[in-house]
Amino acid sequence: MVSEITHKSYPLHFVLFPFMAQGHMIPMVDIARLLAQRGVKITIVTTPHNAARFKNVLSRAIESGLPISIVQVKLPSQEAGLPEGNETLDSLVSMELMIHFLKAVNMLEEPVQKLFEEMSPQPSCIISDFCLPYTSKIAKKFNIPKILFHGMCCFCLLCMHILRKNREIVENLKSDKEHFVVPYFPDRVEFTRPQVPVATYVPGDWHEITEDMVEADKTSYGVIVNTYQELEPAYANDYKEARSGKAWTIGPVSLCNKVGADKAERGNKADIDQDECLKWLNSKEEGSVLYVCLGSICNLPLSQLKELGLGLEESQRPFIWVIRGWEKNKELHEWFSESGFEERIKDRGLLIKGWAPQMLILSHHSVGGFLTHCGWNSTLEGLTAGLPLLTWPLFADQFCNEKLAVQVLKAGVSAGVDQPMKWGEEEKIGVLVDKEGVKKAVEELMGESDDAKEIRRRAKELGELAHKAVEEGGSSHSNITSLLEDIMQLAQSNN
């Protein structure tokens, strides 16, 4: 095991580059704390606004003696054609700004290079989000190994790896509705073309950016994955083999949040009083509450959100519904009051407008299920809490995560969404699951059928395995040790 003594004789210094989006930043901050707990000096490079989001959690970590520091770099917004103040993905008012955002982020190469010239001690390793391909140039210039972090599971990473090597499979499909089987996969899993996060061709600037990301992926020294061996063993083994052994599963990283305040403020300060939330949860029966959260970048149209709300109401089960605080939802809040929805569900439903203390809620004994958009952080947090999932994927890797949870792990029920909610086409796509479909899916998950009971048993089992994985001697704990030993050997051979 890498010991404190070894660190003191040859201190390791990891520089972390999180991508500026909540779903990417949250696990990277957890990774920083996990590594710092092993005596590694950590430097996090981010922008002022993003640093402010994690100020409380990181301040507590630093005050407890963890060797973590934050270096802030200004995002060159204007130079990239981005309005000032747009420092996070979830702050973009339209996805048209996404290309400008990615350009701005990757223009940080020059100021970061200057930082590295002055950094002490010299960095031993870079851990970078895959959305930041410029960090490969920094790693090459300073001869530092770069570890990639995708924020996805091994199931999805292996799927992407196979489909990139066999592009003709997706390219030869006759339509977006045609299904195909992923070859060389441990299980038989079918997708349609829009459901997989592998673009066969993207035009203009997008093509250049995605190619840069793929190239940076290929040339990275290795990969860390926020998952645990026992959750997806066949996929973890095959992906590790595809990466020539340099893939380490170190999750669930969220379990480093043991203090109540860290759980409550993970990612951002909650928009509901913690005591008020706990009081409401304490008033409900064990396992009776459905927690509903479709992520920080939910783009469902108003018509679909109404059907979701009415379906939750008709399910006659207590629920917490987290609604992202963005401009489009103003109409939804008007509907809540004008239609009488908020009044009708006030005794049974809790509406949280904005950011919720998700980890705190998921770990409460009264919560018995999680309706999720299947972002990997949420999927893993739900399973780690031992909760069965009601899956409602929107885009990106979320259909992969649904297939893993429902088909492979058998720890969830699909709401029945079969196509992505494309940005800019939400109104055209409209309602994919009506209120009857929502009510039926909730019953399948939370009801008393044999299937529902088996799904709940399976989810609970996976939750117990998650906690064992991060304990000393567990698979993820051992993999962090293995990663540090690998980087230690490299650092010593380079000097």
UniProtKB/Swiss-Prot annotation:
GO terms for biological process: saponin metabolic process. The monoglucosylated hederagenin 3-O-beta-D-glucoside is a feeding deterrent of the yellow-striped flea beetle (Phyllotreta nemorum). An anthocyanidin binds at H24, A396. It catalyses: oleanolate + UDP-alpha-D-glucose = oleanolate 3-O-beta-D-glucoside + UDP + H(+). This is UDP-glycosyltransferase 73C12. InterPro entries: UDP_glucos_trans, UDP_glycos_trans_CS. UDP-alpha-D-glucose binds at A356, Q358, H373, W376, N377, S378, E381, D397, Q398. Belongs to the UDP-glycosyltransferase family. The active site is at H24, D129. GO terms for molecular function: UDP-glucosyltransferase activity. It comes from the Eukaryota. It comes from Barbarea vulgaris. Keywords: Glycosyltransferase, Transferase. Its EC number is 2.4.1.368.
